[in-house]
């Protein structure tokens, strides 16, 4: 059964992963975000309770 011989298939697997790992990461890392996140304030905003007139 030739499909059980790992010699050609293993090299194809290794070379395809080498191609993916050398081409795709630079393309993905080249993307820039449209807006950088700004650091949020550590102070909690002052919230006041509001009476709901239920009756």
From Swiss-Prot:
Residues spanning the membrane: 4-24
GO cellular component, one term: proton-transporting ATP synthase complex
Residue ranges with Polar residues bias: 38-55
UniProt entry tagged with the keyword Mitochondrion: yes
Keywords: ATP synthesis, CF(0), Hydrogen ion transport, Ion transport, Membrane, Mitochondrion, Transmembrane, Transmembrane helix, Transport
Pfam families (UniProt xref): ATP-synt_8 (PF00895)
Keyword Ion transport: yes
GO molecular function ontology, one term from the record: proton transmembrane transporter activity
Topological relation to the membrane, as annotated: Single-pass membrane protein
Highest taxon in the source lineage: Eukaryota
GO biological process terms on file: proton motive force-driven ATP synthesis
Localization (cell): Mitochondrion membrane
InterPro entries tied to this protein: ATP8_metazoa (IPR001421), ATPase_protein_8 (IPR050635)
Summary of subunit composition and partner proteins: Component of the ATP synthase complex composed at least of ATP5F1A/subunit alpha, ATP5F1B/subunit beta, ATP5MC1/subunit c (homooctomer), MT-ATP6/subunit a, MT-ATP8/subunit 8, ATP5ME/subunit e, ATP5MF/subunit f, ATP5MG/subunit g, ATP5MK/subunit k, ATP5MJ/subunit j, ATP5F1C/subunit gamma, ATP5F1D/subunit delta, ATP5F1E/subunit epsilon, ATP5PF/subunit F6, ATP5PB/subunit b, ATP5PD/subunit d, ATP5PO/subunit OSCP.
Described function: Subunit 8, of the mitochondrial membrane ATP synthase complex (F(1)F(0) ATP synthase or Complex V) that produces ATP from ADP in the presence of a proton gradient across the membrane which is generated by electron transport complexes of the respiratory chain. ATP synthase complex consist of a soluble F(1) head domain - the catalytic core - and a membrane F(1) domain - the membrane proton channel. These two domains are linked by a central stalk rotating inside the F(1) region and a stationary peripheral stalk.
Family stated for the protein in its record: Belongs to the ATPase protein 8 family.
Protein name: ATP synthase F(0) complex subunit 8
Record lineage: Eukaryota, Metazoa, Chordata, Craniata, Vertebrata
């Amino acid at each position: 059964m030739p499909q059980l011989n790992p010699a050609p298939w293993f090299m194809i697997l290794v070379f395809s992963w080498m191609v993916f790992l050398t081409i795709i990461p630079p393309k993905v890392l080249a993307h820039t975000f449209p807006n950088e996140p700004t650091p949020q304030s550590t102070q909690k905003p002052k919230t006041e309770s509001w009476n709901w007139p239920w009756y």
